[in-house]
């Protein structure tokens, strides 16, 4: 289920392409839920800027896939189907996991908080009915910026940081994980 970094497109995605890609992802999610009436993990990489598919985002994605699969194994949860693909919005993973949706969401939140790359992952859990379990459902604060303690959404809207600084921070986190062989 890993993606080969050397095949990254480096395509600068436009806002209309990004919106279409998100609609397509939502349609894929609903199709998966019809095939497998168990919770669905929909996994993407948080990638600031217009280039969503790069060697860096694919390597970050691959670490996330490994961590999600290890989590399912550790918890004794069966992965019924899994797939990886690349859309205009970057690498995407989907895993149908036979587990209580609430437990799955709590475990993925913990993974996002405990893994050195967790801040770069966007892990959604959808119930078999198609409802997305949100961080807000668990009274968790919004995601923090990669560079400061502000909300990531506030910094993104205000364009507080240079894109190059954000991308350099992403790559530094990835290189640290690779150097330590963290999965």
UniProtKB/Swiss-Prot annotation:
Domain of life according to the entry: Bacteria
Q: What molecular function does GO assign, one term?
A: holo-citrate lyase synthase activity
Q: What is its EC number?
A: 2.7.7.61
One GO term of the biological process aspect: prosthetic group biosynthetic process
Keyword set, alphabetical order: Nucleotidyltransferase, Transferase
Q: Which reaction does it catalyse?
A: apo-[citrate lyase ACP] + 2'-(5''-triphospho-alpha-D-ribosyl)-3'-dephospho-CoA = holo-[citrate lyase ACP] + diphosphate
Concerning HAMAP family, the annotation shows: CitX
Q: What does this protein do?
A: Transfers 2-(5''-triphosphoribosyl)-3'-dephosphocoenzyme-A on a serine residue to the apo-acyl carrier protein (gamma chain) of the citrate lyase to yield holo-acyl carrier protein.
Please report which protein family the annotation says this sequence is part of. Belongs to the CitX family.
- Name-wise, this protein is Apo-citrate lyase phosphoribosyl-dephospho-CoA transferase
Species per Swiss-Prot/TrEMBL record: Escherichia coli O1:K1 / APEC
